[in-house]
Amino acid sequence: MKIAILSRDGTLYSCKRLREAAMRRGHLVEILDPLSCYMNINPAASSIHYKGRRLPHFDAVIPRIGSAITFYGTAALRQFELLGSYPLNESVAITRARDKLRSLQLLARQGIDLPITGIAHSPDDTSDLIKMVGGAPLVVKLVEGTQGIGVVLAETRQAAESVIDAFRGLNAHILVQEYIAEAKGCDIRCLVVGNEVVAAIERCAKAGDFRSNLHRGGVASIATITPRERDIAIKAAQTLGLDVAGVDILRAARGPLVMEVNASPGLEGIEKTTGVDIAGRMIQWIERHATPEFCLKIGG
């Protein structure tokens, strides 16, 4: 097959691993910067061009689209879909997952357990928002934040009010969430491919922090997950329409809670920790599902 990887930086670990895994299985691979793609939207002859040339047909496309370029990145991916390329994750699913409010609403509707969460736009009634999620301590986040950026633990009501008031000055969308103390600064990242959790790690925050993101200095170790955690991770990914997802779970006293579903999970931390060839599993999924029948369906 001919496979395109949509990424702004082909030197990143995940891109290199996906390219290596695909080539090892005999596929042709090209890495394309989605922001350098431009599209001819034409009922007679739509096409995608890249750096002065019209791109050939690709059997499959692997989107590695950062949150900062979600709008144009998913537009480019959608054009590939309309031209009959199989997407490892569909553009509509990525857009759905990147919208934190929408994704939480969909997960809640499906009965998936979540931390108690409130979302507001520059709320005037700060005290009621805090009360709504059970009071302090609580976590305050910018809805648009990623990798632990724009996330604050407010341990008292006064601190929570101060943080929310500060965020209000940014004219931003604010997410307020109960703090799960028993998780002790750790979460479980489940890597879902299709209907299977292919690997799982526990990520724990560095001393003095509560954010477990590896980009923020968190430490990873192999996790043994329960059947319930496995099922909730798969259900969360499927609810958002994702074939590949990183599902972050908090271990609360009342059971596993889904904190976030990542549509473009990094592979470095979880592959190096577990030794699982996740990139290879993703390519195998493409091989099983990038059929002519599917491509004709999505292209239409």
Curated annotation (Swiss-Prot):
Role summary: An L-glutamate ligase that catalyzes the ATP-dependent post-translational addition of glutamate residues to the C-terminus of ribosomal protein bS6 (RpsF). Is also able to catalyze the synthesis of poly-alpha-glutamate in vitro, via ATP hydrolysis from unprotected glutamate as substrate. The number of glutamate residues added to either RpsF or to poly-alpha-glutamate changes with pH.
Superkingdom of origin: Bacteria
NCBIfam families: PRK10446.1 (NF007764), rimK_fam (TIGR00768)
Residues holding ATP: K141, E178, Y179, D187, R211, S212, N213
Cofactor info, note text: Binds 2 magnesium or manganese ions per subunit.
EC number(s) reported in the record: 6.3.2.-
Gene Ontology BP annotations: protein modification process; SOS response; translation
Residues in ATP-grasp domain copies: 104-287
Binding site for Mg(2+) 1: D248, E260
Cofactor: Mg(2+); Mn(2+)
Keywords: ATP-binding, Ligase, Magnesium, Manganese, Metal-binding, Nucleotide-binding, Protein biosynthesis
Organism: Salmonella typhimurium (strain LT2 / SGSC1412 / ATCC 700720)
GO molecular function ontology, one term from the record: ATP binding
HAMAP family: RimK (MF_01552)
List of residues binding Mn(2+) 1: D248, E260
Binding positions for Mn(2+) 2 per the UniProt entry: E260, N262
Binding-site residues, Mg(2+) 2: E260, N262
Family from the record: Belongs to the RimK family.
Pfam families attached to this UniProt entry: RimK, Rimk_N
GO cellular component, one term: cytoplasm
Identification of the protein by name: Ribosomal protein bS6--L-glutamate ligase
